[in-house]
C-alpha cells in the first residue's frame, strides 16, 4: 500500500474518531438533566418555606439579574452583556403565561441543578447553574415557594436573547456543557466546622461568587468554585478582585 493511501486512511480514521467524539460530547451535554423523574413531594408553599426562600433569594441576589432597571421586581428583561452577545434575564414572577406560575418544583429544580428550562431547552450559563447545581432540593423548593407566594405576578414576555451565531444554538450549548458542566451537589468537608461548611455551601452554590471572582477561559467557563483569585468580568471592563489575596479585597484578613 502506498504512503499516500496510508495517509488518506489515517486521515479518514482520525476524522471519524473526531466526529464520534464530538457526537458523544453533544449527546452528553444535551441529555444531561433531561430525564429526571419527579420523585419529590408536592411543593410546600407554607409561610415558613416562603420566609426561608426569601432569605435564600437575597443570599443568591436573584433580583439583581431578574429585575430590569426601573422595572418590576423579578419580571426579567435586564440585559447581561457577554463576549458572545447579550442574554436577557427571564421573568420569574408567578405569572402563569409569561413567568413561572405553571412551573412545578421539579421544573425549578431542573433549571437550578441542570441548567434546563421547563420546556427542555438548555439555558445559557449566564444563568449560573454551574454554581447553582450545588444548591440542595430543599432550598430550591423554598426559593420557589417564595417566588410563587410572595412575589407579585407580572405579565411581561421574555425578551429574546441577542447572542451571535454559532453561540445562539442548542448544539453550541450542548458542546459547552459537555466540556465544562457536570451536575453535582455540595460535598461538605468532615474535617471542617459546621459554620465553615455552611459558608462554603453559600459561596460555592447559591452565592455563585466564582461567577465574578474567578478567571474565565475564552469560552466563558470559570475556574473551580473555590478558586476565588479574581478575574476580569467579560464585556464589562470591570475587575472582580481576589477574595483570597490580602493585597486585593483582603477578605481573609477581615
Label every model-predicted segment.
Residues 82-107, 130-138, 226-254:
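Electron-transfer interface patches adjacent to heme c in soluble/periplasmic c-type cytochromes
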Residues 57, 87-89, 122-124, 207, ...:
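Extracytoplasmic
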Residues 53, 59-69, 108, 143, ...:
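The canonical Cys-X-X-Cys-His
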Residues 34-58, 175-204:
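Electrostatic cytochrome c docking/interface patches
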Residues 155-171:
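Extended, well-folded interaction surfaces typified by the phenylalanyl-tRNA synthetase beta subunit core
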Residues 21-27, 104-118, 131-156, 253-254:
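C-terminal capping alpha-helices of c-type cytochrome domains
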Residues 56-96, 100-101:
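Extracytoplasmic/periplasmic/luminal assembly and interaction segments
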Residues 2-37:
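N-terminal type II signal-anchor transmembrane helix
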Amino acid at each position: 500500500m502506498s504512503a499516500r493511501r496510508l495517509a488518506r486512511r489515517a486521515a479518514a480514521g482520525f476524522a471519524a474518531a473526531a466526529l464520534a467524539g464530538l457526537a458523544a460530547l453533544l449527546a452528553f451535554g444535551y441529555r444531561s438533566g433531561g430525564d429526571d423523574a419527579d420523585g419529590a413531594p408536592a411543593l410546600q408553599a407554607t409561610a415558613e418555606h416562603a420566609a426561608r426562600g426569601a432569605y435564600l433569594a437575597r443570599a443568591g441576589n436573584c433580583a439583581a439579574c431578574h429585575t430590569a432597571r426601573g422595572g418590576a421586581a423579578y419580571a426579567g428583561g435586564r440585559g447581561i452583556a457577554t463576549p458572545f452577545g447579550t442574554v436577557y434575564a427571564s421573568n420569574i414572577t408567578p405569572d402563569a403565561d409569561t413567568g413561572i406560575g405553571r412551573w412545578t418544583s421539579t421544573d425549578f429544580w431542573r433549571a437550578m441543578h441542570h441548567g434546563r428550562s421547563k420546556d427542555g431547552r438548555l439555558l445559557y450559563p449566564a444563568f449560573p447553574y454551574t454554581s447553582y447545581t450545588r444548591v440542595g432540593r430543599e432550598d430550591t423548593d423554598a426559593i420557589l415557594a417564595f417566588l410563587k407566594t410572595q412575589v407579585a405576578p407580572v405579565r411581561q414576555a421574555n425578551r429574546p436573547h441577542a447572542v451571535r451565531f454559532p453561540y445562539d444554538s442548542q448544539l453550541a450549548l450542548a458542546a459547552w456543557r459537555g466540556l465544562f458542566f457536570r451536575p453535582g451537589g455540595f460535598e461538605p468537608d468532615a474535617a471542617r466546622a459546621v459554620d465553615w461548611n455552611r459558608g462554603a455551601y453559600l459561596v460555592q452554590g447559591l452565592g455563585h461568587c466564582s461567577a465574578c471572582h474567578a478567571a474565565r477561559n475564552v469560552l466563558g467557563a470559570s475556574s473551580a468554585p473555590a478558586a476565588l483569585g479574581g478575574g476580569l468580568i467579560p464585556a464589562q471592563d470591570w475587575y472582580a478582585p481576589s477574595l483570597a489575596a490580602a493585597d486585593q479585597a483582603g477578605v481573609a484578613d477581615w
